[in-house]
C-alpha cells in the first residue's frame, strides 16, 4: 500500500518522444507506469521520489530539464516492512520529499540552460502557476487544470498554458489536443528558446 496520485506519466513520455524525434539525446526518468518508450531514449525507472532525485542528480548537467512528473510532496516518516493490520484509527506521520525542480533550477554549477516545470492546478491556475514559476526559479511553468476530466491525469488529451519567466514573451495557451501534439508544440518552443 502506498500514497500516490492519479498521474499516468503520459505527458512526460510524449515529451521524451518529441525531444528524441527532434534530435535531442533524451533521458527519461520515470516513476512506476506501464507505458512504453522508444529504444533510442535512455529510460531510468524509479519507484520513489528519493530515487528520482538521485537519478536526476546523476544525469546533470543537461541542456534542458523538463519536470512533468507529479512527484509526491510527502513520504511516510517511517516505512513499514509488514502489512499494517486493520484497526479503528491510524495516524501516519509524513515528512517532505526533496523538491527536485527547486533543487535543479537553483543549482549554480549544473543548472540547465532551460528548466521547465509543470503545475497541476485545481483553482487560481494562472496565479498559482506564476507563483510557482517565481518560487522555484524556473524558466517556464506549464500549467493545466486537473479538475477537467477531459485533460490531465490519465487522459490522452491535454490543454496547457506556458508561463514564461521572461516577460518579454507572452504566456501561451496550447488548446485542447492529443498529448503527443501538445508535446510537439512544447518541444518546438524549447528549440526556439535554445536558438
Residue ranges and their predicted role:
Residues 1-48:
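Glycine-rich phosphate/diphosphate-binding loop of Rossmann-like nucleotide-binding domains
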Residues 26, 65, 115-116:
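Hydrophobic/aromatic residues located in beta-strands of well-ordered beta-sheets
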Residues 32, 36, 40-102, 106:
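A glycine- and small/hydrophobic-rich beta-loop-beta segment
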Residues 8-12, 31, 72, 117, ...:
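Glycine-centered flexibility sites
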Residues 30, 70, 164-166:
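Short, small-residue-rich loop/turn micro-motifs
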Residues 18, 76-180, 185-195:
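Glycine-rich phosphate/nucleotide-binding loop
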Amino acid at each position: 500500500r502506498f500514497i500516490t496520485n492519479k498521474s499516468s506519466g503520459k505527458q512526460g513520455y510524449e515529451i521524451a518522444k518529441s525531444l528524441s524525434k527532434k534530435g535531442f539525446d533524451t533521458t527519461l526518468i520515470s516513476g512506476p507506469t506501464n507505458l512504453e518508450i522508444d529504444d533510442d531514449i535512455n529510460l531510468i525507472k524509479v519507484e520513489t521520489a528519493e530515487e528520482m532525485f538521485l537519478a536526476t542528480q546523476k544525469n546533470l548537467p543537461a541542456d534542458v530539464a523538463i519536470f512533468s512528473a507529479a512527484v509526491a510532496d510527502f513520504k511516510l516518516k517511517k516505512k513499514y516492512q509488514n502489512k499494517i493490520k486493520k484497526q479503528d484509527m491510524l495516524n501516519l506521520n509524513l515528512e517532505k520529499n526533496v523538491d527536485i525542480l527547486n533543487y535543479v533550477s537553483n543549482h549554480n554549477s549544473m543548472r540547465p540552460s532551460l528548466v521547465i516545470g509543470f503545475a497541476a492546478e485545481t483553482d487560481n491556475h494562472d496565479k498559482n502557476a506564476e507563483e510557482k514559476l517565481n518560487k522555484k526559479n524556473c524558466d517556464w511553468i506549464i500549467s493545466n487544470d486537473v479538475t477537467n476530466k477531459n485533460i490531465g491525469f490519465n487522459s490522452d488529451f491535454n490543454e496547457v498554458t506556458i508561463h514564461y519567466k521572461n516577460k518579454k514573451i507572452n504566456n501561451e495557451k496550447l488548446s485542447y489536443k492529443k498529448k503527443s501534439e501538445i508535446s510537439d508544440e512544447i518541444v518546438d518552443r524549447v528549440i526556439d528558446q535554445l536558438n
